[in-house]
């Protein structure tokens, strides 16, 4: 299994990956002919940020201690980072002292009741390790038979990368895989010493070449909202949208609710599945 600090993306690795994605033209620099590597050179990033090249090199080599907020904000602008990518940069560069090393594994009974009380659309609670902690009957009917799975198997990253039927269940597998890796990257930045996260990423790295390839991109993703498709053996493909809500008073527990457009085939499919779950 990889070492913890290898699994949690280092600041240097993240900076190198991100500057390779930004062309000189993207930041208004003149072309300089053929380049050996894609993206910006170290000295170009340093110039954009207002740093010496030596200091920026020390940042990429992990030899600069806790860069200031001003430096990190300037790096985020120069590398054109999104809000999630900027947050990840801060996590890597300025780890919070005393931060919890693991994610809560239990759901408050009242939160579990909230999920169960959602009658007509799939809903679940997951953490940023992708552990599914609570679900309603429609989520179990559509996504996976969570009650029949062992606790460690109730993890969407394992379902995506290690389940041989994953591409059948998830018609949008490529996007689902990329966003799942992005969530794990953000979690690793927040909690590089979380033992369960270390074990999970090690297991996925050993078991899935696709995961290893995506992990090497340093892509980060914060689950918020968007389209999601599932394929069910009885009702076929179901096109939904999801919205994500941070569960109050918990560490990185998310309520995810999937909804169908009114009058759509997906709504009819969910209605039929709901009838089956009550039969």
Where are these regions (language model features)?
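Recognition helix of helix-turn-helix/homeodomain-like DNA-binding domains
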Residues: 32-36, 42-43, 49-66, 74-76
């Amino acid at each position: 299994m990889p070492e913890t600090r290898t699994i949690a993306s280092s600041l240097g690795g993240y900076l190198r990956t991100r500057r390779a994605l930004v062309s000189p033209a993207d930041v208004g620099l003149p072309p300089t002919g053929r380049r050996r590597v894609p993206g910006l050179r170290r000295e170009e990033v340093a110039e954009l940020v207002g740093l010496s090249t030596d200091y920026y090199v020390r940042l990429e080599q992990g030899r600069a201690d806790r860069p200031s907020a001003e430096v990190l904000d300037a790096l985020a602008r120069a590398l054109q980072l999104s809000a999630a990518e900027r947050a990840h940069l801060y996590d890597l560069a300025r780890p919070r002292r005393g931060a919890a090393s693991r994610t809560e594994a239990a759901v408050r009974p009242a939160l579990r009741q909230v999920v169960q009380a959602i009658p007509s659309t799939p809903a679940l609670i997951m953490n940023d390790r992708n552990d599914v902690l609570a679900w309603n009957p429609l989520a179990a009917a559509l996504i996976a038979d969570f009650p029949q799975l062992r606790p460690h198997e109730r993890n969407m990253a394992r379902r995506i990368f290690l389940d041989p039927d994953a591409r059948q269940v998830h018609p949008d597998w490529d996007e689902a895989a990329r966003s799942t890796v992005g969530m794990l990257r953000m979690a690793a930045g927040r909690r590089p010493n979380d033992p369960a996260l270390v074990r999970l990423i090690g297991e996925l790295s050993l078991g899935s070449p696709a995961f290893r390839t995506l992990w090497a991109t340093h892509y980060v993703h914060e689950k918020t909202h968007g389209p999601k498709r599932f394929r069910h053996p009885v009702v076929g493909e179901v096109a939904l949208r999801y919205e994500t809500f941070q569960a109050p008073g918990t560490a990185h527990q998310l309520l995810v609710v999937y909804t169908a457009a009114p009058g759509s085939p997906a709504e009819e499919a969910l209605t039929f599945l709901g009838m089956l779950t009550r039969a």
